[in-house]
Amino acid sequence: MTSIFFNRHYPTIESACERWGLVYDPDAEFELVFEDNILTLIKRDEPKLKGISVDFVSGAVAHRRKFGGGRGQSIAKAVGLKQGVMPTVVDGTAGLGRDAFVLASLGCKVLMVERHPIVAALLEDGLRRAYEDAEIGGWMQQRMSLFHGSSIDSLADAAKASNTEVDVVYLDPMYPHREKSALVKKEMRVFQSLVGADLDADGLLAPAMALATKRVVVKRPDYADDLDGVKPSMVIATKKNRFDVYVKAAMTA
């Protein structure tokens, strides 16, 4: 069970906490509130930091959907998205769902798997609002879904529950930042203090390789070691990150 402080003025907060197994604690580090019909996580000892929510409808993700480069983006190349090929993807470390949304907006069917209950609650709330949106709601309902569980233990269960045959498993485990690196974005500071680094991330590769029929893609900082010490088949490098691609079979239409 995860302790959380929440504003009891909102009955939907109580139902959300009951659904996700969250326990009221007046001394908790984090607070869940509804602001303008959006479930938001606040770090209580840093009130100047912006709260965290999942928004697939507006803001940065909407801008990227419209102007982010389409299929020319590195993430699209990494998962094998091309003319006539629209892979089904399991995002095994969903986080705030941004990479999953990019892939869904490009036409992929994406199942998000998230093990942290608070993050899963934020994702579900983001999906709720996206499903109701007049512009993107139709294809969001068809392409994006959520499973709450650990990808180390439950990856195959997630795919089975959604009746999904998986072409690609996508992983972006939280990696410790270098001490000398620039200050982490304020929003990510809140997120990282909640979930911490994925110290068991090496355990993700084997179940991902077992589930994916075509490839596994691992997003890593440019300075990070290969996941579980396994060299990828190919690497797609960006300015600060890289996509390690473990190929099992060709991507065909």
Swiss-Prot record:
Location(s) in or outside the cell: Cytoplasm
A Pfam family it matches: SAM_MT
Task performed by this protein: Specifically methylates the guanosine in position 1516 of 16S rRNA.
Gene Ontology CC entries for this record: cytoplasm
Biological classification of the source: Bacteria, Pseudomonadati, Pseudomonadota, Gammaproteobacteria, Alteromonadales
Keywords from the UniProt entry: Cytoplasm, Methyltransferase, rRNA processing, S-adenosyl-L-methionine, Transferase
Enzyme superclass (EC): transferase
HAMAP family named in the record: 16SrRNA_methyltr_J
The reaction(s) this protein catalyses: guanosine(1516) in 16S rRNA + S-adenosyl-L-methionine = N(2)-methylguanosine(1516) in 16S rRNA + S-adenosyl-L-homocysteine + H(+)
Record-given protein name: Ribosomal RNA small subunit methyltransferase J
Gene3D superfamilies assigned to the protein according to its UniProt record, in alphabetical order: Vaccinia Virus protein VP39, YhiQ-like domain
InterPro entries reported for this sequence: 16SrRNA_methylTrfase_J, SAM-dependent_MTases_sf
Predominant place of localization: cytoplasm
A GO molecular-function descriptor: rRNA (guanine-N2-)-methyltransferase activity
